[in-house]
From Swiss-Prot:
Keywords: Coiled coil, Differentiation, Glycoprotein, Golgi apparatus, Membrane, Nucleus, Spermatogenesis, Transmembrane, Transmembrane helix. This is SUN domain-containing protein 5. PROSITE patterns: SUN. Changing M160K: Increases interaction with DNAJB13. Impairs nuclear inner membrane location, expressed in the cytosol with some protein aggregation near the nuclear envelope. InterPro entries: SUN1-5, SUN_dom. Residues 204-362 form the SUN domain. It comes from Mus musculus (Mouse). It is a single-pass membrane protein. Disruption phenotype: Mutant males are infertile. Spermatozoa are acephalic, the sperm head to tail coupling apparatus is detached from nucleus during spermatid elongation. Probable homotrimer. Interacts with DNAJB13.
Length: 373
């Protein structure tokens, strides 16, 4: 086939009278002819690219423009060859022509992207000047400071947690101290806010004629060369003093006894308080020497008449117990007798630590008695 032959003549197909009743339009043939005109004269010669790829000194934009020009010529060549091959045997020339155009554009885009990606540098190098180095150095220093301050904050947080733990321990110790002070107040009886008319320091005393004998045990005596020197047993008036410590008590034999207390002055009686040490500080560890069943009598000076005021039971679990008198006659008394009927299990002796008597020197408000002269 001669090289100068028109491509339009080669691609002309006989008219298909079976599918359409009219011949193909000449516009399509002329359009195909125009598309084939830019083809080179000699198709077998190698293609000569308009740009040199490895020319030194060219920028990236110039290289890309050269690649695009080369790809454009390559796409035109491929499209022309494809049209010559397929359009001579294809009846749907217009459809095939559009398909070839789309395929050519797609191939062009894919090939261009591939070439662009192949010639991109594997690592982008950033040229830094003095205007960039300064802020970057400042940023690094700021990061180091932030990291350092973060460590300091964590250390401060740990120290704060330790301080909180110490404060909690101090609060616990303070609570324990408050509890100990409360216990001491309970032992000393400071929480009972009533006047004690049986207190020795204000004039109260013991009527020894109407009081049981003191219990004398061999261990409460001291001997030197088998000669008795001193009896360490406490007298009955120890129950009128506020010093309540282990051993500082009045003991009488067996589980029955009594003590008569002369009050500092005549009193309209209302309450009586008994106190004993807790078993936790007792040397024996048992409250068996504490009194149990108690009867209270009021005594007048002349004549000495006993008036029943009440009967109670002392519980050793509560070291201080205040009892409300059951019988409150409308008169005053100069003395009080405390009668012990039993203790909490010790058959040899019973201990009494402190007895307090409460009331008022004036008649109660609900009575219509005359004040004492």
């Amino acid at each position: 086939m001669p090289r100068t032959r028109n491509i339009g003549a080669l691609c002309t197909l006989p008219e298909d009278t079976t599918h359409s009743g009219r011949p193909r339009r000449g516009v399509q043939r002329s359009y195909i002819s125009r598309m084939a005109e830019p083809a080179p004269a000699n198709m077998n010669d190698p293609l000569l690219l308009p740009l040199r790829m490895n020319t030194p000194g060219l920028s990236l934009v110039q290289i890309l423009l050269g690649y695009m020009s080369w790809l454009t010529y390559l796409a035109c060549f491929l499209r022309t060859q494809t049209q010559q091959v397929f359009l001579n045997t294809c009846r749907c020339k217009l459809f095939c022509q559009k398909v070839m155009e789309k395929m050519g554009l797609l191939v062009l885009c894919v090939f261009g992207f591939w070439m662009f990606s192949m010639h991109l540098p594997s690592k982008v190098e950033v040229w830094q000047d003095d205007s960039i180095n300064g802020p970057l150095q400042s940023l690094r220093m700021y990061q180091e400071k932030v990291r350092h301050h973060t460590g300091e904050i964590q250390d401060l947080r740990g120290s704060m947690n330790q301080l909180i733990a110490k404060l909690q321990k101090m609060e616990a110790i303070s609570d324990e101290q408050k509890m100990a002070q409360k216990i001491m107040k309970m032992i000393q009886g400071d929480y009972i806010e009533k006047p004690d008319f049986a207190l020795k320091s204000i004039g109260a005393s013991i009527d020894f004629e109407h009081t049981s004998a003191t219990y004398n045990h061999d261990k409460a005596r001291s001997y030197w060369n088998w000669i008795r020197l001193w009896n360490y047993a406490q007298p009955p008036d120890v129950i009128l003093e506020p010093n309540v410590t282990p051993g500082n008590c009045w003991a009488f034999a067996s589980d029955r006894g009594q003590v008569t207390i002369r009050l500092a002055q005549k009193v309209y009686l209302s309450n009586i308080t008994l106190q004993h040490i807790p078993k936790t500080i007792s040397l024996s560890g048992s409250p068996d020497t504490a009194p149990k069943d108690i009867v209270i009598y009021g005594l007048e000076s002349l004549p000495r008449e006993e008036v029943f005021l009440g009967a109670f039971q002392f519980q050793p679990e509560n070291v201080i117990q205040m009892f409300q008198l059951q019988n409150l006659p409308p008169r005053s008394f100069a003395a009080v007798k405390v009668k012990i009927s039993s203790n909490w299990g010790n058959p040899r002796f019973t201990c009494m630590y402190r007895v307090r008597v409460h009331g008022s020197v004036t008649p109660p408000k609900d009575s219509h008695l005359e004040p004492l002269s």
